[in-house]
Regions:
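Acidic/glycine-rich C-terminal interaction modules and beta/coil loop segments
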Residues: 77-191
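Short amphipathic alpha-helical leader/targeting segments
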Residues: 18, 61, 116-117
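General structural signal for secondary-structure boundaries
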Residues: 11, 22, 69-74, 168-176
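Extended boundary segments
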Residues: 22-73, 189
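Generic structural signal for alpha-helix starts
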Residues: 2, 74-76
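Helix-turn-helix-like N-terminal two-helix hairpins of bacterial/phage DNA-binding regulators
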Residues: 1-35
Length: 191
């Protein structure tokens, strides 16, 4: 701890960099557009009015299949846009500094392949956070699996891990199977 304090005293620019990162999130402006159906997912995606909770669970909502009745936003990304992608705001501090509180992120509801070590949106169906009553969370997905004699596997434990060390992971066991759903993968922090 003393080494960290000494390093911070020698280099005070860390505070200025932190303030610039916070300002970047606050200055980010969404560009709402009204695309024709054939223009959707070319340079714009739907803005889901879901404030995904990075510290707790969000309001019970569902992510659709791309037929959105929401606002559309133009985004600047190197990614090839496709149906199932959307922008949502992440609130909470558990994923800082990777995802700043209040940041808008690009997500894809089609999570393909392994989820291991990916940042995902998870819905807990059968439970809510006792303090907030919310259901969605954004966390890094880690799982332990067991393989049976017939070659099939099952989850022994899933950890939904925050980036911020001030927060604890959410641990799910095989008893929680069926009550948890990965609904999207976080692709990019937009601002």
């Amino acid at each position: 701890a003393a080494d960290i304090r000494d390093a911070l005293r020698r280099d005070a620019t860390w505070f200025q960099r932190l303030r610039k990162a916070d300002a970047a999130v606050k200055e980010f402006v969404l560009h709402l557009v009204k695309p024709k159906p054939e223009e959707r997912f070319t340079n714009c995606v739907p803005l889901i009015p879901l404030k995904v909770a990075a510290g707790n669970f969000g309001e019970p909502q569902t992510v659709g299949d791309g037929e959105w009745d929401y606002d559309w936003v133009e985004i600047n990304t190197h990614r090839h846009l496709r149906k199932g992608m959307f922008v949502a705001q992440v609130v909470g501090k558990s994923m800082e500094p990777m995802i700043p509180d209040g940041a808008y992120c690009l997500f894809c509801s089609q999570v393909e392949g392994t989820r291991q070590s990916r940042t995902v949106v998870v819905l807990l169906r059968d439970t809510t956070d006792p303090e907030t009553g919310q259901r969605f969370t954004v966390k890094r997905y880690e799982s332990e699996k067991a393989v049976s004699a017939d070659g099939t596997w099952r989850h022994i434990k899933v950890l939904l891990k925050p980036v911020n060390k001030d927060f604890n992971p959410i641990e799910l066991t095989c008893e929680d199977e069926g009550s948890v759903e990965v609904v999207a993968e976080m692709l990019e922090v937009l601002g």
